[in-house]
Amino acid sequence: MISLGHLLALGAVLFCISLAGIFLNRKNVIVLLMSIELMLLAVNVNFIAFSRQLGDTAGQLFVFFILTVAAAEAAIGLAILVTLFRTHHTINVAEVDALKG
């Protein structure tokens, strides 16, 4: 059986990896979106760990809501990415610095 400490450590490691992905690679939109999704999954691991430790299902239900919002966020982010690539022919954030209609 996995202890609470191990699950929290896993969540912290995933969160730190996602922070490193955001800070080390700010130019690529795909890496930024993947890092944000990994950050949300790290938070979900912590919710599941505490929910399991306390014997309450509220944390597990909250994770389902977070996953739903994360899926919608990923769909909107990918739609923006496709539009960005079609108009500017790049996915580099540094090259796209102006919002034009």
UniProtKB/Swiss-Prot annotation:
Signal sequence segment: none
Pfam families for this protein: Oxidored_q2 (PF00420)
Reaction(s) the record says it catalyses: a quinone + NADH + 5 H(+)(in) = a quinol + NAD(+) + 4 H(+)(out)
Top-level class of the enzyme under EC nomenclature: translocase
Cellular compartments annotated: Cell inner membrane
GO molecular function, one term: quinone binding
Domain of life: Bacteria
Transmembrane residue ranges: 4-24, 30-50, 62-82
GO biological process: ATP synthesis coupled electron transport
GO CC entries: NADH dehydrogenase complex; plasma membrane
Assigned keywords, A-Z: Cell inner membrane, Cell membrane, Membrane, NAD, Quinone, Translocase, Transmembrane, Transmembrane helix, Transport, Ubiquinone
EC number from the UniProt entry: 7.1.1.-
Principal location class: membrane
Topology in membrane: Multi-pass membrane protein
Assembly, per entry: NDH-1 is composed of 14 different subunits. Subunits NuoA, H, J, K, L, M, N constitute the membrane sector of the complex.
Function: NDH-1 shuttles electrons from NADH, via FMN and iron-sulfur (Fe-S) centers, to quinones in the respiratory chain. The immediate electron acceptor for the enzyme in this species is believed to be ubiquinone. Couples the redox reaction to proton translocation (for every two electrons transferred, four hydrogen ions are translocated across the cytoplasmic membrane), and thus conserves the redox energy in a proton gradient.
Family: Belongs to the complex I subunit 4L family.
The protein, known as: NADH-quinone oxidoreductase subunit K
Species of origin: Xylella fastidiosa (strain Temecula1 / ATCC 700964)
Gene, per the UniProt record: nuoK
